[in-house]
UniProtKB/Swiss-Prot annotation:
Glycans are attached at N198, N394. This is EGF-containing fibulin-like extracellular matrix protein 2. It is found in: Secreted, Extracellular space, Extracellular matrix; Secreted, Extracellular space, Extracellular matrix, Basement membrane. GO terms for molecular function: calcium ion binding; heparin binding; protein homodimerization activity. CDD domains: EGF_CA. Belongs to the fibulin family. N-glycosylated; contains mostly complex-type glycans. Not O-glycosylated. Cleaved by ELANE; produces a 50-55 kDa fragment. Cleaved by MMP2 and MMP9; produces several fragments. The keyword Transit peptide does not apply. Homodimer; disulfide-linked. Multimer; allows heparin binding. Monomer. Interacts with FBN1 (via N-terminal domain); this interaction inhibits EFEMP2 binding to LOX and ELN. Interacts with LOX (via propeptide); this interaction is strong and facilitates formation of ternary complexes with ELN during elastic fiber assembly; this interaction limits interaction of EFEMP2 with FBLN5. Interacts with PITX2. Interacts with ELN with moderate affinity; this interaction regulates ELN self-assembly maturation stage. Interacts with FBLN5 with moderate affinity. GO terms for cellular component: basement membrane; elastic fiber; extracellular matrix; extracellular region; microfibril.
């Protein structure tokens, strides 16, 4: 109460109270806003209508409802309902009113049936008409007068829902198993393929399927191996083959020359030789085979790697020919007094680089006189001392190669046998003229 209210008349007191109330409110507090643009949750301001309008959260919020639920918008919010749920709009709300169902007549048919045009009772397909309460994860199967909710193949019922069966837990697959929604798939390791039952794995014959082997392919369990023909070796890539250069491995494969060829090698011999099965080279005896060009007045002499045609009569005055390769100097001829009584022509062949000392030719006296002594010597042709004589006994001696010689080369050695008899003061000599052919090779 005002302190002075008791002193004022009643009318003045009412007037004073009105003035006090009007003065207590400031002009700013009595002003109202020109417009309102803020809306409550679930609404937004519409500038055209100058009113708040509902926000459709089902369109503006991504994945507003999870799983198999469907989003239903309503004023100021939204609902997440099962997809089988139906929503009846309020007749007093916005939008057209729901249609008025026609007048229904009593159904004379048992549950799950309905009359047709002929007034016969036919089954109601609840699955096709969505008159069932099966879960979205279930399959609806129509039955006479009813329906059944079952889980699809590969699913099992857990509570009201159907969940995927992990078939891989039961090891249906031989190798690898991949679980899929409602099913599974078997896979095989490399080198295998699924069998007819789509579960077991069978070996793949890569060799029949164009394996990248260059020469030979061998199939094995789960894989394959490449191999090469004889004379080839497998490359590092495991598929291609490279020729083996056998000639580079050893210098003893062939006696003369080794020639590498694709997948093999061959041995060759020089002219005048033939190749043996042992890969050795053997001299061809042209004189024996007739592969020579000597005339009838000549004698064919074979040596290592070739032959020589020599005259049949090689006797030079004062010698006369008495037989093949033998010349005799008559005693009646004064020119023969200082000459050997006979000269016999012989021929032989040796190889190059022969090991020394080597016995190469044996000299043998054809006749022996009582009390005679025979001495053997090299009369001519040994200017470099490549040979020497080793006397064995009174009637024989050996021609010895003193040092290695390299061909092709030819020696003509006069090997003399001197016969002496001191009691009869007798001295005579004969010569064996030996032609030695040295071949060009060590074989």
């Amino acid at each position: 109460m005002l302190p002075f209210a008791s002193c004022l008349p009643g009318s003045l007191l009412l007037w004073a109270l009105l003035l006090l109330l009007l003065g207590a409110a400031s002009p700013q507090d009595s002003e109202e806003p020109d417009s309102y643009t803020e809306c409550t949750d679930g609404y937004e301001w519409d500038a055209d209508s100058q009113h708040c309008r509902d926000v459709n959260e089902c369109l503006t919020i991504p994945e507003a409802c999870k799983g198999e639920m469907k989003c239903i918008n309503h004023y100021g919010g939204y609902l997440c309902l099962p997809r089988s749920a139906a929503v009846i709009n309020d007749l007093h709300g916005e939008g057209p009113p729901p249609p008025v169902p026609p007048a229904q007549h009593p159904n004379p048919c048992p549950p799950g049936y309905e009359p047709d045009e002929q007034e016969s009772c036919v089954d109601v397909d609840e699955c096709a008409q969505a008159l069932h309460d099966c879960r979205p994860s279930q399959d609806c199967h129509n039955l006479p007068g009813s329906y059944q909710c079952t889980c699809p193949d590969g699913y099992r019922k857990v509570g009201p829902e159907c969940v995927d069966i992990d078939e891989c837990r039961y090891r249906y697959c031989q190798h690898r198993c991949v679980n899929l929604p409602g099913s599974f798939r078997c896979q095989c390791e490399p080198g295998f393929q699924l069998g007819p039952n789509n579960r077991s794995c069978v070996d793949v014959n890569e060799c029949d399927m164009g394996a990248p082997c260059e020469q030979r392919c061998f199939n094995s369990y789960g894989t394959f191996l490449c191999r090469c023909n004889q004379g080839y070796e497998l490359h590092r890539d495991g598929f291609s083959c490279s020729d083996i250069d056998e000639c580079s491995y050893s210098s003893y494969l062939c006696q003369y020359r080794c020639v590498n060829e694709p997948g093999r090698f061959s041995c060759h011999c020089p002219q005048g030789y033939q190749l043996l099965a042992t890969r050795l080279c053997q001299d061809i005896d042209e004189c024996e085979t007739g592969a020579h060009q000597c005339s009838e007045a000549q004698t064919c002499v074979n040596f290592h790697g070739g032959y020589r045609c020599v005259d049949t009569n090689r006797c030079v005055e004062p010698y006369v020919q008495v037989s093949d390769n033998r010349c005799f100097c008559p005693v009646s001829n004064p020119l023969c007094r200082e000459q050997p009584s006979s000269i016999v022509h012989r021929y032989m062949s040796i190889t190059s680089e022969r090991s020394v000392p080597a016995d190469v030719f044996q000299i043998q006296a054809t006749s022996v006189y009582p009390g005679a002594y025979n001495a053997f010597q090299i009369r001519a042709g040994n200017t470099q001392g490549d040979f020497y004589i080793r006397q064995i006994n009174n009637v024989s001696a050996m021609l010895v190669l003193a040092r290695p010689v390299t061909g092709p080369r030819e020696y003509v050695l006069d090997l003399e046998m001197v016969t002496m008899n001191s009691l009869m003061s007798y001295r005579a000599s004969s010569v064996l003229r030996l032609t030695v052919f040295v071949g060009a090779y060590t074989f």
